[in-house]
């Protein structure tokens, strides 16, 4: 459930189409957001929505579904030129994601990210402002 705008709606990660889908509570389509790399999960805190993308980044959206930030963006290395691989830890760089499968907000706004990589990797992103 997504209530960031003040009105509840259903938010869906559509990995097959690389989109986020939004429906009203009766199941009627409201909005489709394109341009996501295998969105894996959603979490909200206040007016923000957190979208971990298996294609190497975390996206934050505001209550109007506008992109506020893209965190740890590593799409170029992981998806396009394939120089980073989830089974090869020596290719991973601090501050860059490889395969974020799940993420959630802590009550204070920190973000925890779990990546689906060979050894597993959990990252804490501390809220700074």
Feature annotation, model-predicted:
Residues 1-129:
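Eukaryotic scaffold repeat domains enriched in small/polar residues
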């Amino acid at each position: 459930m997504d209530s960031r705008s003040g009105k509840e709606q259903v938010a869906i990660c559509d990995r097959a189409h690389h989109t986020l889908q939004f429906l009203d509570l009766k199941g009627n389509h409201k909005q489709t957001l394109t341009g996501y790399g295998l969105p894996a999960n959603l979490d909200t805190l206040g007016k923000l929505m957190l979208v971990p993308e298996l294609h190497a980044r975390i996206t934050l959206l505001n209550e109007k579904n506008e992109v506020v930030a893209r965190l740890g963006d590593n799409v170029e290395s992981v998806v396009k030129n394939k120089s980073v691989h989830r089974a090869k830890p020596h290719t991973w760089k601090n501050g860059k994601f490889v395969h974020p499968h799940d993420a959630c907000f802590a009550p204070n706004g920190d973000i925890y990210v779990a990546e689906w990589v060979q050894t597993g990797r959990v990252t804490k992103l501390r809220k700074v402002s």
